[in-house]
């Protein structure tokens, strides 16, 4: 932990997905002295590394910030727990491990909104490929297509970010693929080509049956570099600023707290905020960068009046549970002593079986309505069921079909509650507060029922256990969505990047805070609009892009 040396070229705040990649890339230049600050502990907790260990990391203060939302009007007054990774690797150490880029149109839209073509799909694809290590290119020829020419145009090999296929399959999920195909959702073997429409098994960020986090991929291999320093359990209290003779405001460092001791750290080049979509806006607001009205209400001196904390977007998921017959599900296995023993032994000796599972094994991307111009729904399908996350599985065979709106129009916010850095901010996603989001929720529930009613599923005699077929009208389904919908932990957008003249954008297209020198934000908070899928790998792409700009002096 801190010694007498508190001057560095680059200070990275947050040792999560983006921070780990940035630390790797910036320290690759020997002249750069890089400090990575992480509020959580080292990622030595054993459950981090076992895929099913997310069950013991989410909701655990050892690895989770333990946030909760405010009561949500769109969720009929319910509050949601809001997990965020608090350890090296950040959310990549506790998430669902699904490798998902989103759609090419997401990045074309970012380029349009920012006025900068370096955010388009072509440039984003190059950044994804730069750190990708895809199993389908391990032996040269792609085992699925028989060649690697077209696949290698879209994917990389030899990078740090390992992508593997899942290590087990389930008959009931294979049948769901067929049922979706009967509905017109085509099968796909690659959700990451730029058009993720289709149905198939997710690829995952694992290596040989272990979770492959950003810490393992990007940080551990380079921690011995003499120009890279990593401090854990280091809480950033505020950013520090000074005004030059020309009147320009510069961020010259940070004040951190470590075990009750305040330490000032100086950044000779840049401070890079990579604390995530909740903590990055909180740190900015506490430091005087944010909406003037909010800051003044807490007695904070305004450095820059800018909409930090606004534009919060998230994916909200509606979960349906179906009882099934005549097939094996995880419920069946875990409700017997023999089954549990088999699961443990299978992982111990083969690194396979249910302990190697991601939370969701199968996915589908499709339209909620034929009039939609592109896929706006993502399905997460599981051979298991439970009442709520963290509870025991049901004692009957069942499957869960969850579906989320990929392009919500509801917008929320993150706002500090006090001037204390240890006080959790107010998190208000404002779920289901637009007519369009409620319409998508209704359509998605009806679509789930149609898929489960296809011939391929009839052999399992599926019975809708939750929410129940008694809910049929638009009004009933809207109210139902408010009762049962839950976040799938993809908050983004709270420190928006955009065109230099956009008053709603906090950052310029190269992620520099407008109105301040020496300060950049690089994490999921910069997204002007949420990507059409899981958000962890897009966050790494953002960091890859930013690292290139920083190293080239842009």
Predicted feature locations:
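N-terminal redox-cofactor-binding region of secreted/periplasmic oxidoreductases
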Residues: 1-554
């Amino acid at each position: 932990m801190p010694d007498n040396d508190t001057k560095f070229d680059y200070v990275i705040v947050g040792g999560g997905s983006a921070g780990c990649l940035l630390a790797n890339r910036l320290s690759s230049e020997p002249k750069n002295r890089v400090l990575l600050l992480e509020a959580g502990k080292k990622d030595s907790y054993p459950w981090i590394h076992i895929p099913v260990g997310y069950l013991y990391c989410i909701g655990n203060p050892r690895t989770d910030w333990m946030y909760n939302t405010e009561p949500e009007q769109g969720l009929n007054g319910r509050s949601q727990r809001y997990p965020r990774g608090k350890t090296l690797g950040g959310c990549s150490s506790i998430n669902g491990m699904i490798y998902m880029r989103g759609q090419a149109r997401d990045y074309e839209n970012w380029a349009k909104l920012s006025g900068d073509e370096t955010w388009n799909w072509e440039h984003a694809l190059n950044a994804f490929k730069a750190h990708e290590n895809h199993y389908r290119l391990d032996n040269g020829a792609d085992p699925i297509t028989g060649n690697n020419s077209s696949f290698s145009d879209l994917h990389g090999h030899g990078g740090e970010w390992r992508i593997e296929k899942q290590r087990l399959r389930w008959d009931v999920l294979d049948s769901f693929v067929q049922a979706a195909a009967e509905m017109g959702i085509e099968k796909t073997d690659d959700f990451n080509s730029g058009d993720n429409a289709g149905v198939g098994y997710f690829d995952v960020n694992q290596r040989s049956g272990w979770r492959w986090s950003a810490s393992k991929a990007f940080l551990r291999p380079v921690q011995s570099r003499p120009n890279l320093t990593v401090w854990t359990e280091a809480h950033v209290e505020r950013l520090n600023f000074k005004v030059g003779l020309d009147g320009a405001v510069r961020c010259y460092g940070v004040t951190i707290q470590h075990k009750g001791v305040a330490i000032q750290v100086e950044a000779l080049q840049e401070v890079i905020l990579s604390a995530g979509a909740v903590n990055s806006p909180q740190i900015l607001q506490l430091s005087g960068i944010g909406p003037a009205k909010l800051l003044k209400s807490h007695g904070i001196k305004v450095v820059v009046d800018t909409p930090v904390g606004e534009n919060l977007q998230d994916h909200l998921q509606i979960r349906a549970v179906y009882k099934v017959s005549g097939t094996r599900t995880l419920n069946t296995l875990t409700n017997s002593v023999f089954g549990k023993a088999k699961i443990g032994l299978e992982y111990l000796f083969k690194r396979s079986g249910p302990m190697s599972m991601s939370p969701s094994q199968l996915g589908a991307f499709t339209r909620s309505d034929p009039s939609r111009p592109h896929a706006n729904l993502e399905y997460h399908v599981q051979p298991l069921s439970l009442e709520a996350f963290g509870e025991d599985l049901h004692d009957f065979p069942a499957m869960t079909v969850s579906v989320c709106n990929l392009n919500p129009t509801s917008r929320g916010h993150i706002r500090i509650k006090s001037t204390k850095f240890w006080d959790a901010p107010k998190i208000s996603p404002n779920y289901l507060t637009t007519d369009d989001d409620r319409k998508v929720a209704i359509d998605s529930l009806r679509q789930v029922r149609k898929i489960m009613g296809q011939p391929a599923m009839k052999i399992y005699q599926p019975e809708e256990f939750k929410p129940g077929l008694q809910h049929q009208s638009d009004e009933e389904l809207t109210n139902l969505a408010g009762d049962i919908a839950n976040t799938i932990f993809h908050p983004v957008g709270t420190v928006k990047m955009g065109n230099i003249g956009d008053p709603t954008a906090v950052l310029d297209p190269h992620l520099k805070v407008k109105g301040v020198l020496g300060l950049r934000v690089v994490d999921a908070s910069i997204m002007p609009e949420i990507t059409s899928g899981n958000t962890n790998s897009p966050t790494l792409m953002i960091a890859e892009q930013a690292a290139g700009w920083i190293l080239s002096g842009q």
